[in-house]
Amino acid sequence: MKATKILIPTICALTGLLAACGGTSDEVSQEAQSEPKVQEAPAPTPDQQVAGLEAMCAEAQPAIAARQAEDSLFNRVGGRDSIHKAVAETVRLHQINEPIKHLMEGVDPAHLTEQVTDFLVLATGGQGEYGGRNMVDAHAHMKMNNAQFLAAGGDLGKGMTFAGWGENEKQELLCAFVGLRPQVVTSES
């Protein structure tokens, strides 16, 4: 009965139908204020979020391996064009994502898109050549922290969605991305 007592005045207040609900905004406000408030848990820290991702990826590893045994990620996402589309959108998002956009200053987005596409084509089972730097050398100067790593991963997720990738394929590449974290995160702040 207590939930109904709170819910009806709240719905009335939100919909602006106070007269139809038989009360005034003051009555609704006083009644809502008298109910105890539930304390929300604090948001997880970037370190906690990364630990959660690492645990999720470890748990998903058998399913990922089974999918890879059937067909490469490269083939399942539609090849180079699909990878390029996801990477181009990810790079575009990096340029406007507040926590990481400063890392993109002075970077040629077209060149970066081609380099990352070449890297991912090979990493996902496609054929080609990658002539870029290794992960450590490519990211050391950035002094990236976990919060920035998560921001970049969020952009990657959006890029894969933009390219039309399925949930399993997105999870697979994000888990590979999480596996590279020790090579790219070099700062704790």
How would you name each of these model-derived features?
Residues 1-10:
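Bacterial N-terminal signal peptides that target proteins for export
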Residues 23:
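Short, conserved catalytic or interaction motifs in soluble domains
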Residues 17-20:
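C-terminal motif of bacterial Sec signal peptides marking the signal peptidase cleavage site
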Residues 26-189:
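Core of compact, soluble alpha-helical bundle domains
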